[in-house]
Amino acid sequence: MIIHPNFDPVAIHLGPLAVRWYGLMYLVGFIAAIVVGRIRLKLPHVAAQGWTAKDIDDMMFYGVLGTVLGGRLGYVLFYKADFYFSHPLDVFKVWEGGMSFHGGFLGVTLAMVLFAWQRKRHWLQVTDFVAPMVPAGLAAGRLGNFINGELWGRVTDPNAPWAMLFPGAMRDDAAWLSKHPALVEKWHLADVFMQYQMLPRHPSQLYEIALEGIALFFVLFFFSRKPRPLGAVSALFLIGYGLARFTVEFAREPDDFLGLLALGLSMGQWLSLPMILAGIALLVWGYRRRPVNAAA
């Protein structure tokens, strides 16, 4: 078993200002997205559409607003609506954590629609250009989750090579023991807990880096190197992310205040299903519509 390093959540201190790893990873993610975007400017079919480095910089401004506002509101509405309706001022306490990818996705989509309207472009042309830039940011964000030792995975066999002990999960681990007696006996978890006061879990943040970040990046980057029908790159992102997130959720610990929902699926899985379906519909629409020269 591997013990999570339990990093200090503060990366650096600048006088009275504490720069946290999670915020730093957001910055790294946006910078990585800009780098990917500038690489894409060199593709002939992208350059032919008149994209410039300034467009990317302006787009990132919209993207930051969409990510932060949408991510926070999505968490409030999708995950803890009852709490925040009772404590509305707590919505603004972003330093206490609480961001939703699906909310951030909706926020960024709306931001890109606004950007497209201002630049008099088709909004799908904008999202097709942006889609390959997103996985780099997702990977950085999940790395921030791992450094913080949060959003850990479900309990697993202590003999599994991926088994990891998360100090931040101690309280959850103690409660888990009484709820799953069969697995406690099967995996001899009582002995493990006696020794470490923790239970072995999937490092699901690393799975998400691998699937939602690295794998999805390469799929989108190489798919978009050639001209594609309008909406095709965006559709592949929806399908790819939705499938990756849906899969990883089987290894990720559900939010304790929600648990598993209908059909034994998590909130993340239920929110990913519409993405997959929308992606399939958009892909079919794009290829039926053609023309390839409209692609990003």
UniProtKB/Swiss-Prot annotation:
Disulphide bond pairs: none
Enzyme class: transferase
Entry coiled-coil feature ranges: none
Enzyme Commission numbers on file: 2.5.1.145
Associated pathway: Protein modification; lipoprotein biosynthesis (diacylglyceryl transfer)
Cellular localization per UniProt: Cell inner membrane
Record-annotated membrane-spanning stretches: 17-37, 59-79, 97-117, 129-149, 203-223, 230-250, 265-285
Membrane topology: Multi-pass membrane protein
GO biological process: lipoprotein biosynthetic process
Keyword Transmembrane: yes
Keywords from the named record: Cell inner membrane, Cell membrane, Membrane, Transferase, Transmembrane, Transmembrane helix
Binding site for a 1,2-diacyl-sn-glycero-3-phospho-(1'-sn-glycerol): 142
GO cellular component: plasma membrane
Similarity field: Belongs to the Lgt family.
NCBIfam families documented for this protein: lgt
Name of the protein this chain belongs to: Phosphatidylglycerol--prolipoprotein diacylglyceryl transferase
Gene name tied to this protein: lgt
